[in-house]
Amino acid sequence: VLMFGWEFPPHIAGGLGTACYGMTRGLARNGVEVVFVMPRAYGDEDQRFVRVVNASDVETIGTRDHEFSEELLEKVSFIHIDSNMLPYISPEEYAAYHDEFVRSGRTHEWTDVWKQRYTFSGKYGANLMEEVARYAMVAAQVAKDLEGQFDVIHAHDWLTYFAGIAAKRVSGKPLVVHMHATEFDRSGENINRRVYAIEKAGMQAAD
């Protein structure tokens, strides 16, 4: 099982990490191998029955899925700088080049090559949405790196749903999304619409 979770004991902020711990331990007792990917691992996690992968240590290398990136941008607010810049042209020329490329209908050929390692706080701070989006990029890389080594993807709560979706698109493996609490459970009627949209996307993508 390739599992994505935002926290894992002993570094937890609530019940999410505790639930992840209990589930991975239960799966291990039934002979299931689990790879648990978290934004930031500290090295003191109990790995007797689970392999913990620190997303902050994963180097993402490859090409960007343009359509998936556009879907992310519709739901997540963060500053994105494209890497397909051309030397010796002005910003206006680059904008015209980019617009023409999109209009040509060849966006499926647009593959920005990138190599990046992201540092995650693993917290619930002001840049949480940005970390959620970057975590999805790392998830895609992990799924590539572990090709043939897992049979199912398990994503815990909305924070990891984009990661689960990305891993599914790369691997073609079935996705299980685990809803520990909905945005309505947490916030009542005054929900965060972006969080709700991510929850909805995760549920729709699940198998």
Give each language-model segment a name.
Residues A155-T160:
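Short His-centered aromatic/hydrophobic patch
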Residues I153-H154, Q204-D207:
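A short beta-strand/loop micro-motif in the catalytic core of glycosyltransferases
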Residues E7-A19, G43-Q47:
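A short, glycine/small-residue-rich beta-strand->loop->alpha-helix junction that serves as a flexible
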Residues G17-A28:
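Short amphipathic alpha-helix
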Residues W6, P39, M179-T182:
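Histidine-centered beta-alpha loop that forms part of the nucleotide-sugar donor binding/catalytic region
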Residues V32-D145:
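A conserved catalytic-core segment of Leloir-type glycosyltransferases
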Residues K144, G148, F162, L175-N192, ...:
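A short, histidine- and acid-enriched strand-loop-helix "catalytic/donor-clamping" loop
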Residues V132-V138, S171-V176, F184-A201:
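Nucleotide-sugar donor phosphate/pyrophosphate-binding loop at the beta->alpha transition
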